[in-house]
């Protein structure tokens, strides 16, 4: 699996996930509390969202754009 790994809105930095990491995630905040930041990466399980945070998980290559 390959996931995007940069926090900018338009990201093209691709990372090959390690064994056991079969999920790509992207997190962002309701109301843009941190400005336009979208932390992304690989995970074994979908990360839990913090208050006012939205986490999207998917399992195909580069799906976390």
Swiss-Prot record:
Protein name per Swiss-Prot or TrEMBL: Weak toxin S4C11
One Gene Ontology cellular component: extracellular region
Disulfide bridge map: 3-24, 6-11, 17-42, 46-57, 58-63
Family, similarity comment: Belongs to the three-finger toxin family. Ancestral subfamily. Orphan group II sub-subfamily.
Locations listed in the record: Secreted
Role, per record: Binds with low affinity to muscular (alpha-1-beta-1-delta-epsilon/CHRNA1-CHRNB1-CHRND-CHRNE) and very low affinity to neuronal (alpha-7/CHRNA7) nicotinic acetylcholine receptor (nAChR).
InterPro entries named among the record's database cross-references: Snake_3FTx (IPR003571), Snake_toxin-like_sf (IPR045860), Snake_toxin_con_site (IPR018354), Toxin_cobra-type (IPR054131)
Pfam annotation, one family: Toxin_cobra-type
Additional information: The geographical location for this forest cobra population was Rhodesia.
Lineage: Eukaryota, Metazoa, Chordata, Craniata, Vertebrata
Keyword Magnesium set for record: no
Source species, domain of life: Eukaryota
Gene Ontology MF annotations: toxin activity
Expression by tissue: Expressed by the venom gland.
Keywords: Disulfide bond, Secreted, Toxin
Major location category of this protein: secreted
């Amino acid at each position: 699996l390959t996931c995007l790994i940069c926090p900018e809105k338009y990201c093209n930095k691709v990372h090959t996930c390690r064994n056991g990491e079969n999920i790509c995630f992207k997190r962002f905040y309701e109301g843009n509390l941190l400005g336009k930041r979208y932390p992304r990466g690989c995970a074994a399980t979908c990360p839990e969202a913090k208050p006012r945070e939205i986490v999207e998980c998917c399992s195909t290559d580069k799906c976390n754009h």
